[in-house]
């Protein structure tokens, strides 16, 4: 028997009807004592999990503000960091800015995150909201 390449097999499958393919799969499972259900279930779970992740992203209510870099106007960024993060002294704010990327605010609402991002970007910093 001549060995068929993957392309040859795919071409043969393309010419078959769904009913014929279904019968082929049943015979394949019986002949080799395998099941095609496990890979199909995993593949089906993938998009469902992705859809759930996308839905969770839409409903996200808590955000993290991360300082990626201070940019060229470091002093202005330090001042804004002291304003945004309560209880920071000058040295702590400077250390935080110098050690970027660092989270500045964690689990804040969208308005607070966008407000902080706007102030930091106006001061010359690079910021991401996650």
UniProtKB/Swiss-Prot annotation:
Q: Which InterPro entries match?
A: Ribosomal_bL12, Ribosomal_bL12_C, Ribosomal_bL12_C/ClpS-like, Ribosomal_bL12_oligo, Ribosomal_bL12_oligo_N_sf
> Which residues belong to the signal peptide in this entry?
none
This protein's record includes keyword tRNA-binding: no
Q: Which terms in the Gene Ontology molecular function aspect does this entry carry? A: mRNA binding; structural constituent of ribosome
Entries under Pfam families matching the protein:
Ribosomal_L12 (PF00542), Ribosomal_L12_N (PF16320)
Q: Briefly, what is this protein's role? A: Forms part of the ribosomal stalk which helps the ribosome interact with GTP-bound translation factors. Is thus essential for accurate translation.
NCBIfam families named among the record's database cross-references: L12
Protein name per the record: Large ribosomal subunit protein bL12
Q: Specify the species.
A: Mycolicibacterium vanbaalenii (strain DSM 7251 / JCM 13017 / BCRC 16820 / KCTC 9966 / NRRL B-24157 / PYR-1) (Mycobacterium vanbaalenii)
């Amino acid at each position: 028997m001549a060995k068929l390449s993957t392309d040859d097999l795919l071409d043969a499958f393309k010419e078959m009807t769904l009913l014929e393919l279904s019968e082929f799969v049943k015979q394949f499972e019986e002949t080799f004592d395998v099941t095609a259900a496990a890979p199909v279930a995993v593949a089906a779970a993938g998009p469902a999990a992705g859809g759930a992740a996308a839905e969770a992203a839409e409903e996200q209510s808590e955000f993290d503000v991360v300082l990626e870099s201070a940019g060229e106007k470091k002093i202005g960024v330090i001042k804004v960091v002291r304003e945004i993060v309560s209880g920071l002294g000058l040295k702590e704010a400077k250390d935080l800015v110098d050690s970027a990327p660092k989270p500045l605010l964690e689990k804040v609402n969208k308005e607070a995150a966008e407000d902080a991002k706007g102030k930091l970007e106006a001061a010359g910093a690079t910021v991401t909201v996650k």
